[in-house]
């Protein structure tokens, strides 16, 4: 591996390997870990779940003897989120540093990575039943207007389109307003993460072909059967669809919502390509917010 540009000094105490889906992040991170004595912290919103293997590209053999963290840490009964990730990633980072190894964050979930790099203030906020009762009956537009009155940043703008998430955002904004010292307490206990950030990128047409070939390989290896098995274990179609992409389209295909295998493969392929574009957009936004990404064109 060519590490000529990789200069880890006192300025950096960790590495981030990011990129769109199918850019080879895990393989690259494993190579770095072997060269630099590192351990990998996964930043993938679905690889945290046990049982989501083929659909998430969770190839544990690829890690070899390189230690990895935040993979297979919870079951599908639980909704894992960015707050959980930030806390778990902090713990993994400190554990790795205590053992004098190099933490390497690797993944494509931009929200998760951004929460570490730009230090989102994610505070444990209890439910406010009184506030929820006062807002009951308001429609989405009214809740959005109410939220904007707090004048606080929204890290994930899709939360504005979901009633439950928007209600939670209002709850958090109200808590911060009434507990102004909460963020200071959080920041005082936050580990000092100063990563060198490496971004992997392929030309568009090559990336699309990599996505296509990988999808066909996953289907051949049993991704449809994996999804069917999860449903037989008791997980609803709705839960599987909520996981997005591979599990969403495969669940729809198994239910007969997608009529043919050809339509299933084509629809899923196009959705993954669109997802890759959204990931690239997220990383560009991170750069606009001052995050320095060292891009490696593959």
Swiss-Prot record:
GO BP annotations listed: tRNA modification
Broadest EC class assigned to this enzyme: transferase
Binding sites annotated in the UniProt record for substrate: 21-26
Swiss-Prot/TrEMBL catalytic activity: adenosine(37) in tRNA + dimethylallyl diphosphate = N(6)-dimethylallyladenosine(37) in tRNA + diphosphate
Site (Interaction with substrate tRNA): 109
GO molecular function ontology, one term from the record: tRNA dimethylallyltransferase activity
Annotated stretches, region: Interaction with substrate tRNA: 44-47
Leader peptide range in chain numbering: none
Names of required cofactors: Mg(2+)
Positions of disulphide bridges: none
Keywords annotated in UniProt: ATP-binding, Magnesium, Nucleotide-binding, Transferase, tRNA processing
Function recorded in the entry: Catalyzes the transfer of a dimethylallyl group onto the adenine at position 37 in tRNAs that read codons beginning with uridine, leading to the formation of N6-(dimethylallyl)adenosine (i(6)A).
Protein name as annotated: tRNA dimethylallyltransferase 2
Annotated source species: Treponema denticola (strain ATCC 35405 / DSM 14222 / CIP 103919 / JCM 8153 / KCTC 15104)
């Amino acid at each position: 591996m060519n590490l000529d540009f990789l200069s880890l000094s006192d300025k950096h105490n960790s590495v981030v390997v990011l990129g769109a889906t199918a850019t080879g992040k895990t393989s690259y991170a494993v190579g770095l870990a072997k060269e630099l004595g590192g351990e990998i912290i996964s930043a993938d919103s679905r690889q945290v779940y046990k049982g989501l293997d083929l659909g998430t590209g969770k190839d544990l053999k690829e890690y070899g003897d390189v230690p990895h963290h935040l993979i297979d840490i919870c079951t599908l009964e639980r909704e894992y989120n960015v707050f959980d990730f930030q806390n778990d990633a902090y713990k993994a980072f400190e554990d790795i540093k205590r053992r004098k190894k190099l933490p390497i964050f690797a993944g494509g979930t931009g929200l998760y990575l951004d929460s570490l790099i730009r230090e989102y203030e994610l505070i444990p906020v209890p439910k406010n039943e009184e506030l929820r009762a006062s807002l009951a009956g308001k429609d989405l537009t009214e809740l959005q207007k109410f939220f904007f009155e707090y004048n606080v940043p929204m890290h994930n703008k899709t939360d504005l389109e979901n009633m439950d998430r928007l209600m939670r955002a209002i709850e958090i904004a109200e808590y911060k307003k009434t507990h102004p010292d909460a963020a200071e307490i959080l920041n005082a206990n936050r580990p000092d993460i100063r990563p060198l950030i490496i971004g992997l990128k392929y030309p568009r047409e090559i990336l699309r072909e990599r996505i296509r070939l990988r999808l066909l390989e996953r289907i051949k290896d049993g991704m449809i059967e994996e999804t069917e098995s999860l449903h037989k274990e008791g997980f609803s179609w709705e839960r599987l669809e909520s996981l997005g992409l591979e599990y969403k389209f495969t669940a729809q295909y198994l239910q007969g919502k997608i009529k043919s295998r050809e339509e299933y493969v084509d629809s899923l392929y196009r959705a993954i390509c669109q997802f890759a574009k959204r990931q690239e957009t997220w990383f560009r936004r991170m750069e606009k917010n001052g995050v320095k990404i060292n891009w490696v064109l593959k």
